[in-house]
Amino acid sequence: MTLPTLTNLLIMTLSYILPILIAVAFLTLVERKILSYMQARKGPNIVGPFGLLQPVADGVKLFIKEPIRPSTSSPFLFIITPILALLLALTIWVPLPLPFPLADLNLGLLFLLAMSSLTVYSLLWSGWASNSKYALIGALRAVAQTISYEVTLAIILLSTIMLSGNYTLSTLAITQEPIYLIFSAWPLAMMWYISTLAETNRAPFDLTEGESELVSGFNVEYAAGPFAMFFLAEYANIMLMNTLTTVLFLNPSFLNLPPELFPIALATKTLLLSSSFLWIRASYPRFRYDQLMHLLWKNFLPLTLALCLWHTSMPISYAGLPPI
């Protein structure tokens, strides 16, 4: 590999990673501001104008602190897990069309599904390597929840593939030329949105960090830099899920918009969806664990399977009919 090629690769990678990290940093500020205004207070307003530099101050503070490792923990896994979590959270963005993906994969949706499944390992290893009963119980809860809700996410993705006829994310824009999929497949969109809340361990499904029983969940033993990495990974996953929701169900089209406006439309819709994540956090109490599992296995799974069957059978049944 020549030096110009390496330089080009580095520039491309940085140009796609840095905006994500900056967006994630400011998402934390948006969350604190929204929650504070909902609770009739000001929120962060000291660091910088209107508190805009608060994420920078928080990041610097966390990364210059001394990372503490429990003496009984597993050293290698304890250190490698937060790095793996952040690396996976950033890698998943590769096939997303913003408007052009970093790598236009033929099986982009399957890549997303496979990479999001790998995040389970970072949760499990962090809980196990901490050698703490609270961290382990929190990790087991998180893994059970993530694996469970991935089932419905996969089936809903399969249904959207049936509608678009392709595994690439770019074709979803062409599929949604006449109408957004959120209107034509609204039951799927509703279940997808609730499943993304559970998949990212957000309220009201944040059972992994039940403070009254688990202190803080799987990352209870982490501090300073490693904790910041987990935090960044969690919020990067929230941004990713909302971007994916926009691409799947609210995709702004190439034909209706100039390419320059595509990222603006995508970012606006993603921000609105992320804000509704935060609104839900401020509004709803936490679910009981059995309710969380019943919602998936007894309600969502039969419904998504039926809708997937419907989306599979309808094109076949219409195939023999003459055009209207």
Swiss-Prot record:
The organism is Gallus gallus (Chicken)
Q: Which compartments is it annotated to reside in?
A: Mitochondrion inner membrane
**Carries keyword Plastid?**
no
User: Per its UniProt entry, which superkingdom is the organism in?
Assistant: Eukaryota
EC number from the UniProt entry: 7.1.1.2
Q: What is its main location?
A: mitochondrion
Q: What is the lineage of its organism?
A: Eukaryota, Metazoa, Chordata, Craniata, Vertebrata
User: Quaternary structure?
Assistant: Core subunit of respiratory chain NADH dehydrogenase (Complex I) which is composed of 45 different subunits.
Q: Which HAMAP family is this protein grouped with?
A: NDH1_NuoH
Asked whether the UniProt record includes Mitochondrion among its keywords, one would answer: yes
A Gene Ontology cellular-component term: mitochondrial inner membrane
Q: Which GO terms describe its molecular function?
A: NADH dehydrogenase (ubiquinone) activity
Question: Which protein family is it in?
Answer: Belongs to the complex I subunit 1 family.
Protein name from the UniProt record: NADH-ubiquinone oxidoreductase chain 1
Name the residues that span the membrane.
10-30, 76-96, 107-127, 154-174, 178-198, 230-250, 260-280, 300-320
Any one biological process term the GO annotation gives? aerobic respiration
**How the protein sits in the membrane?**
Multi-pass membrane protein
Q: Any idea what job this protein has?
A: Core subunit of the mitochondrial membrane respiratory chain NADH dehydrogenase (Complex I) which catalyzes electron transfer from NADH through the respiratory chain, using ubiquinone as an electron acceptor. Essential for the catalytic activity and assembly of complex I.
Q: Which Pfam families does this UniProt record tie to the protein?
A: NADHdh (PF00146)
What general EC class does the enzyme of this chain belong to?
translocase
Q: What is the catalytic activity of this protein? A: a ubiquinone + NADH + 5 H(+)(in) = a ubiquinol + NAD(+) + 4 H(+)(out)
Keyword terms: Electron transport, Membrane, Mitochondrion, Mitochondrion inner membrane, NAD, Respiratory chain, Translocase, Transmembrane, Transmembrane helix, Transport, Ubiquinone
